[in-house]
Swiss-Prot record:
Expressed in liver, kidney and spleen (at protein level). Ubiquitously expressed, with the highest expression levels observed in brain, heart, liver and kidney. Transmembrane segments: none annotated. GO terms for cellular component: axon cytoplasm; BLOC-1 complex; cell-cell contact zone; contractile ring; cytoplasm; endosome; filamentous actin; focal adhesion. GO terms for biological process: actin filament bundle assembly; adenosine metabolic process; amino acid metabolic process; anterograde axonal transport; anterograde synaptic vesicle transport; ATP metabolic process; blood coagulation; bradykinin biosynthetic process. This is Biogenesis of lysosome-related organelles complex 1 subunit 6. Residues 1-10 have a biased composition (Pro residues). It comes from Mus musculus (Mouse). The gene is Bloc1s6.
Length: 172
């Protein structure tokens, strides 16, 4: 049993020939496209074309329609997935902003504690300054009394000195 050889390229002889060398074009064969001139060579029946087109459509149309429906369903699913993804992203952003808000509240608590501490210190300082003012007032009053007493004492001593000094007697 022999295996048939593939056909030679268009217009080229592969075997020995009487008048042609190997590799030369064969007379009567064209170097142009194999489809050239087909319409002129074969008569076409419109009814046959319609049947062929109908057969092709009936064979491939159901698969194409199923593919179209599947693509539409995939597109709808993608839209749903995109919407869901956008919702999740917004939830993530809200969660992230909640973390920021929590950080702000923590910072606010910290500063509130500082303010409370400062207020307590200010109240203590106010109390101390009030006590110091009262003490200063008492000391000032005491000094004034002591000064007044010294002045009165000096006046008394001066009066006494005055009385003790010899007075010329009156001549009568």
């Amino acid at each position: 049993m022999s295996v048939p050889e593939p056909p030679p390229p268009d217009g080229v002889l592969t075997g020995p020939s009487d008048s042609l060398e190997a590799g030369e074009p064969t007379p009567g064969l064209s170097d142009t496209s194999p489809d050239e001139g087909l319409i002129e060579d074969f008569p076409v029946d419109d009814r046959a074309v319609e049947h062929l087109v109908g057969g092709l459509l009936s064979h491939y149309l159901p698969d194409l329609q199923r593919s179209k429906r599947a693509l539409q369903e995939l597109t709808q699913n993608q839209v749903v997935l995109l919407d869901t993804l956008e919702q999740e992203i917004s939830k993530f952003k809200e969660c992230h902003s909640m973390l920021d808000i929590n950080a702000l509240f923590t910072e606010a608590k910290h500063y509130h504690a500082k303010l409370v501490t400062i207020r307590k210190e200010m109240l203590l300082l106010h109390e101390k300054t009030s006590k110091l003012k009262k003490r200063a007032l008492k000391l000032q009053q005491k000094r004034q009394r002591e000064e007044l007493e010294r002045e009165q004492q000096r006046e008394k001593e001066f009066e006494r000195e005055k009385q003790l000094t010899a007075k010329p007697a009156k001549r009568t």
